[in-house]
UniProtKB/Swiss-Prot annotation:
Tissue specificity note: Expressed in the root and in the shoot.
Binding site for Mn(2+): 54, 172, 174
GO cellular component annotations of the record: endoplasmic reticulum; endoplasmic reticulum membrane; plastid
Phenotype on disruption: Salt/osmotic sensitivity associated with root tip growth arrest and swelling and the induction of lateral roots.
Pathway terms, separated by semicolons: Protein modification; protein glycosylation
Regions of this protein lying in the Lumenal compartment: 39-124, 164-174, 212-216, 265-272, 327-364, 411-414, 540-779
The name this protein goes by in its record: Dolichyl-diphosphooligosaccharide--protein glycosyltransferase subunit STT3A
GO molecular function: dolichyl-diphosphooligosaccharide-protein glycotransferase activity; metal ion binding
Lineage, highest ranks first: Eukaryota, Viridiplantae, Streptophyta, Embryophyta, Tracheophyta
Length: 779
């Protein structure tokens, strides 16, 4: 039947299909160009630099990989971070991004294209955004056809949520992980539709690449088992479902265990237990279906009872083992981030270091409109379209959007996972809507032309001569008997052929809308798309393209560039010893190591809460106690970020309460209430003495009153409480041009002792001189 339905070569249908395929390829190429080019605003407006904080660590690791090779990379012990502990890089990093960029750099240099490692890192994310758009097309095409796929790919190429993590210079794990996520889902749906073991193997390999790239791979290994369980419960089990799932669990788990940062966690942590439980269930169901096919109904009932009994015993044993493993862990076998997703209040109660990260906070309603814009209104229509008709593939994308909406509501970072699902649903909705509206317009225009033709035919027949009519009557009279008998037979033959066409016409007419309504709706959809494009271009150009290391401000005098961070790191690099240790809050650890090449105490990896709490305690303590803590860590310089002069809100004073909370979680003498006045965080004259005497306050506001004579903080919009004070244990060595970064050096203990000795000596000498003056007879 399939061969009969396929159009013959050279026919209009075949030509139309060939033209459609060529046009689809051309559109996909343009979508890839759009996805790449819309992410280049940061390079055009600023320069080719790495953005944010985490990308600097990835850039540094890629530099090491390209210089020393993969074997040195796996065994690299980095003594520049987490002093004096250090860090084993090969076993604590997701290597997918680094290996991808390193391979691209090696391939280009092999072809005599001498690009620097930094250039490759800057443009990796825009390139993979094009790949992600094409993967979205493939996934949506498997669900609802090529029209929906093209629409979804175009939407993903521009969606602001994805742009925020894939602009040029955003060299983070999500740059390649979102492509891996979508491609893994596509191969799962492809295997589900075809039942091909080849695609199942590719699916396991794509999952392995996702595991290498990002810790968010646990979303895949939980979402797919949920879909398999949904299909089993709703009676949609098939051999294709088994082929799509079983190889993924077996091969995927084995491959995931090869990644050093995952290792045995692939089988020992609670995030993976759902996949193993569903793996057992699908085998029990497959066994039941197999037995049903080879046994009689009576024997089948007996066999089912036996299989279910054995299956329940096995499940009980497995559940008991899992419960024992979970009970042996203080967190129930879950990681802190996973627990914060299941219980949104968990991090704020027990792990403040996780809650202190801005991207781990729940999003606000405006952020949904900012990040997915009009897609939020199209998603419900896409969900409805997936239910008509409901298939295994469409049920998967519905489950995907539901779960991603929940997780994005818990953690703003996971808006990135929601973006592809929203684009897929919106693409399906737009495709269905355009099909209905354009079909209605075509039908209405065709019906109007047919009615005019029928009217012309009727007028011509009415004007026919009467003699011809009478002659026709006599001829017909002779053949009446023959025609009646033949018509009876023809009626019976035509009836079954006519009935389906009538039903099809009725069905078509149910989807036909009035011409005016279709045109208006089509114009509204085009306007909605134009509004979406304008918003996405604005978000790419203004909101998400500014690198955090270089800031700009627009005023009446023109554009002001604040390059204080690079200025400070350059000063550290040129004016300090290579082995000097720099203490700062963990946000700036990666940048300090990568740009200044100096050893830091803590960085953005945040793997050791006690070490971070030690730095937080030092910042929260009085100057003398802080000096003792830093001196015990062999710290030479302290870096503080301050925005009170220019109005930079992401400074250390605004982060200070998190330092207090994290420090107080390990060292009980640090209490948040001591830094608050009537429950309010203040730095003015009403601030508490503990706050005014803390090291963070002193290092931020030292000599600040000299800038305007009042000490007015533009971020907190108030005058500071303690304006005139001196530092006894620290000395200022560098303050950037706009006072954004301030560097202080710890005074050596012998200098301070000598200073005290000099004071004592001067006092004694002055006392002796006064006494001798009294005894001097010449005075």
């Amino acid at each position: 039947m399939a061969a009969l339905e396929s159009p013959l070569p050279g026919t209009p249908t075949a030509m139309r299909n060939a033209f459609g395929n060529v046009l689809s390829v051309l559109i996909l190429v343009l979508i890839g160009v759009l996805a790449f080019s819309i992410r280049l605003f940061s390079v055009i407006k600023y320069e080719s630099v790495i953005h944010e904080f985490d990308p600097y660590f990835n850039y540094r690791v890629t530099q090491f990989l390209s210089k020393n090779g993969i074997y040195e990379f796996w065994n690299w012990f980095d003594d520049r971070t987490w002093y004096p502990l250090g860090r084993v890089i090969g076993g604590t990093v997701y290597p997918g991004l680094t290996l991808t960029a390193g391979t691209i750099w090696w391939g280009l240099n092999s072809l005599n294209i001498p690009l620097s490692v930094e250039t490759v890192c800057v443009f990796t994310a825009p390139v993979f955004s094009a790949f992600a758009s094409w993967a979205t097309y493939l996934l949506t095409k498997e669900v609802k056809g090529s029209g929906a796929g093209l629409a979804a790919a175009a939407l993903l190429a521009m969606v602001p949520s994805y742009i925020s993590r894939s602009v040029a210079g955003s060299y983070d794990n999500e740059a390649v992980a979102i492509f891996a996520l979508i491609f893994t889902f596509y191969l799962y749906i492809k295997t589900l539709n075809t039942g091909s073991l080849f695609y199942a193997t590719l699916n396991a390999l794509a999952y392995f690449y996702m595991v290498c790239s990002w810790g968010g791979y646990t979303f895949i290994i939980n979402l797919i088992p949920m879909h398999v369980l949904l299909c089993i419960v709703t009676g949609r089990y098939s051999p294709r479902l088994y082929i799509a799932y079983a190889p993924l669990v077996v091969l995927g788990t084995l491959l995931a265990a090869l990644v050093p940062v995952v290792g045995f966690n692939a089988v020992l942590t609670s995030e993976h237990f759902a996949s193993f439980l569903v793996f057992i269930i699908i085998h029990v169901v497959a066994l039941v279906y197999y037995i049903k096919g080879i046994l009689s109904p009576k024997m089948f009932k007996v066999a089912v009872t036996l299989v279910v009994s054995i299956g329940m015993v096995v499940c009980f044993i497995v559940v008991a083992i899992l419960v024992a493993l979970v009970a042996s862990s203080p967190t129930g076998g879950w990681s802190g981030r996973s627990l914060s997703l299941l219980d949104p209040t968990y991090a704020s109660k027990y792990i403040p270091i996780i809650a202190s990260v801005s991207e781990h906070q729940p999003p606000t309603w405006p952020s949904y409109f900012m990040d997915i814009n009009v897609l939020a209104f199209l998603v419900p229509a896409g969900i409805i379209a997936c239910f008509s008709p409901l298939s295994d593939a469409s049920s998967f994308v519905v489950l995907y959007i539901v779960m991603s909406v929940y997780f994005s509501g818990v953690m703003v970072r996971l808006m990135l996972v929601l973006a592809p699902a929203a684009c897929i649903m919106s693409g399906i909705a737009l495709s269905q809507a355009f099909d209905v509206f354009t079909g209605s317009i075509k039908y209405q225009l065709g019906a109007s032309s047919n009615s005019t033709d029928d009217a012309e035919d009727n007028t011509s027949t009415n004007n026919a001569p009467k003699d011809d009519v009478s002659a026709g009557k006599t001829d017909k009279g002779e053949e009446i008997v023959k025609e009646r008998s033949s018509k009876k037979g023809k009626k019976k033959e035509r009836e079954p052929a006519d009935k389906p066409s009538v039903k099809a016409k009725i069905k078509k007419k149910a989807l036909v809308l009035p011409l005016e309504a279709s045109i208006v709706a089509l114009l509204l959809l085009i306007m909605l798309g134009a509004f979406y494009v304008i918003h996405c271009v604005w978000a790419a150009a203004e909101a998400y393209s500014a690198p955090s290391i270089v800031l700009t401000s627009q005023s009446r005098d023109g554009l002001h560039v604040f390059d204080d961070f690079r200025e400070s790191y350059a000063w550290l690099s040129h004016n300090t010893d290579v082995d000097d240790k720099v203490a700062s809050w963990w946000d700036y650890g990666y940048q300090t190591t990568a740009m200044a090449n100096r050893t830091v105490i803590v960085d953005n990896n945040t793997w050791n809460n006690t070490h971070i709490a030690t730095v937080g305690t030092a910042m929260s303590s009085p100057e003398k106690a802080a000096w003792e803590i830093f001196n015990s860590l062999d710290v030479k310089y302290v870096l503080v970020v301050f925005g009170g002069l220019i109005g930079y809100p992401s400074d250390d004073i605004n982060k200070f309460l998190w330092m207090v909370r994290i420090g107080g979680g390990v060292f009980p003498h640090i209490k948040e209430a001591d830094y608050l006045r009537d429950g309010q965080y203040r730095i003015d004259s009403e601030a508490t003495p503990t706050m005014l005497n803390s090291l963070m306050y002193k290092l931020s506001y030292y000599r600040f009153v000299e800038t305007d004579g009042k000490g007015y903080d533009r971020v907190r919009r108030t005058e500071i409480g303690k304006k005139h004070f001196k530092l006894t244990h620290f000395e200022e060595v560098f303050t950037s041009h706009h006072w954004m970064v301030r560097l202080y050096k710890l005074k050596p203990p012998r200098n301070r002792i000598r200073g005290k000795a000099k004071k004592l000596k001067s006092k004694t000498s002055s006392g002796l001189s006064s006494k001798s003056a009294k005894k001097n007879p010449w005075v």
